[in-house]
Design a protein with these regions (language model features):
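Extracytoplasmic metal-acquisition and chelation regions
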Residues: 2-14, 20-307
């Protein structure tokens, strides 16, 4: 894949991996000299701002490539950048360091764009995966609502549903237009173009997964609830909402049994989290592993590629 590939192509790679598995039958843009200064908490939100704002906006991604966004700690300079920004795009409850910087800065409502106010959040205890009551062999319903997997909160991974990304795009267009009315037409045009690409992506997912016989996807952590809900899949996360929340021995045995019973052939890992437990499940069941990115951030190897 060429460097600087499109957002659509960048996100379609996980689509291809899902189809193969289920079977069938911290950089910023600084070209703007005097445009709005935007601090985005991590990569997906920074990318939306870049697509809408283009060269008319100065965007800072607060999460550097290779950094697990769940574990973000801000440097003093970044805290100052948040507090001096014309707009901060973030999601409350996802990155505590960003939440704290926003609160300490006493930013006005006009300076804040909280994505949690833009889209409907899923409850973390169901994680969008068990909404239809997925029954497995022997009448056992697989669930991760116990022993650390029930976080009593919401699932923050909203960006993995293209429909949510479209809503976020509209919100960014509106806020940037309020800040810089002279560029409003440009922001609107760019936002419309980006949403068209998101629509193409959604169509690709729906058509590609329509004949998928195995609807379970075993993932490193519970990042894919929105994807699963949107496309009628059942997420089976090894870890919880936080990648570091590893399963208990009983939960791991449950997942391993499920992989065997349902004939799941692929266990998905990701770039920014340890694959150790997923590798164990794959080894014990004869499944293969593949990377399914939750698109939480770029790595050093992919820093020059796009979403």
């Amino acid at each position: 894949m060429k460097k600087k590939s499109s957002a659509l192509l960048g996100v379609m790679l996980p689509t291809a991996l899902l189809l193969a598995a289920c079977g069938s039958g911290g950089t910023g843009s600084s070209d703007a000299d005097s445009g709005p200064r935007v601090a985005a908490s991590f990569y997906p939100f920074a990318y939306v701002v870049e697509q809408v704002g283009g060269t008319a906006v100065d965007v800072e991604n607060l999460t550097s490539p290779g950094t697990e966004p769940h574990d973000l700690e801000l440097k003093p300079r970044q805290v100052a950048d948040v507090q001096d920004a014309d707009l901060v795009v973030y999601e409350t409850g996802f990155q505590a360091a960003v939440d704290e910087a926003v609160e300490q800065g006493d930013l006005s409502e006009d300076q804040r764009l909280d994505v949690a106010d833009v889209v409907t959040l899923l409850d973390a205890s169901e994680d969008g995966a068990e909404s239809d009551g997925h029954d497995h062999a022997e009448g056992e319903e697989h669930s991760h609502d116990e022993e650390g997997h029930d976080h009593g909160s919401t699932d923050p991974h909203v960006w993995l549903d293209p429909a949510n990304m479209a809503k976020i795009t509209d919100a960014v267009v509106e806020r940037l237009s309020d800040i810089d009315p002279d560029q409003a037409a440009t922001f609107e045009k760019n936002g419309t173009a980006f949403k068209a690409r998101l629509t193409e992506l959604d169509t690709s997912f729906r058509q590609g997964l329509a004949q998928c016989e195995t609807r379970d996807i075993v993932t490193s952590h519970a990042a894919f609830g929105y994807l699963a809900k949107a496309y009628d899949l059942t997420q089976v996360p090894i870890a919880g909402i936080e990648p570091g929340n590893e399963p208990t021995a009983a939960q791991l045995a449950d997942i391993t049994r499920l992989v065997r019973q349902d004939g799941i052939t692929t266990v998905f890992t990701e770039e920014l989290a340890s694959p150790a437990v997923a590798d164990t499940v794959a080894s014990e069941t004869g499944a293969t592993t593949a990377t399914l990115s939750p698109i939480e951030g770029l790595t050093d190897d992919t820093a020059d590629e796009t979403y």
